[in-house]
Amino acid sequence: MTNHKLIEAVTKSQLRTDLPSFRPGDTLRVHVRIIEGTRERIQVFEGVVIKRRGGGVSETFTVRKISSGVGVERTFPLHTPKIEKIEVKRRGKVRRAKLYYLRSLRGKAARIQEIR
């Protein structure tokens, strides 16, 4: 087996298959496993996907939400075992792959149209 095929085989075995399909503009609920000392708990982070990047094992996505009037963005590796599950709450209709313009918008201007 050549090096390239070996890397490809190892990479393929690490990919998760239980994740839903989602795109930028969708509203997600990401259930993240957090370990604090000896305790382990699940934290839910709900917001709009503003970007996806990479491919294979190194693929990441960024979710943005407004918490107490402050914008919070969190980037997650897609295939990490720390993500318990991902729920798609709404499908958004956008015409961009990267929604960085949402950072400067507030209130109703930051709404994303829902796909029917």
Curated annotation (Swiss-Prot):
Among the entry's GO cellular component annotations, what is one? cytosolic large ribosomal subunit
Keywords of this entry? Ribonucleoprotein, Ribosomal protein
Q: Which superkingdom heads the taxonomic lineage of this protein's source?
A: Bacteria
Give the matching InterPro entries. Ribosomal_bL19, Ribosomal_bL19_CS, Ribosomal_bL19_sf, Translation_prot_SH3-like_sf
**PROSITE patterns recorded:** RIBOSOMAL_L19
What's a Gene Ontology MF term here? structural constituent of ribosome
Return one Gene Ontology term, BP aspect.
Answer: translation
Please report a single Pfam family linked to this protein.
Answer: Ribosomal_L19
The entry's family comment says:
Belongs to the bacterial ribosomal protein bL19 family.
Q: Which PANTHER family match?
A: LARGE RIBOSOMAL SUBUNIT PROTEIN BL19M, RIBOSOMAL PROTEIN L19
NCBIfam families associated with the record: rplS_bact (TIGR01024)
Q: What does this protein do?
A: This protein is located at the 30S-50S ribosomal subunit interface and may play a role in the structure and function of the aminoacyl-tRNA binding site.
Q: What is this protein called?
A: Large ribosomal subunit protein bL19
Q: What is the lineage of its organism?
A: Bacteria, Bacillati, Bacillota, Bacilli, Bacillales
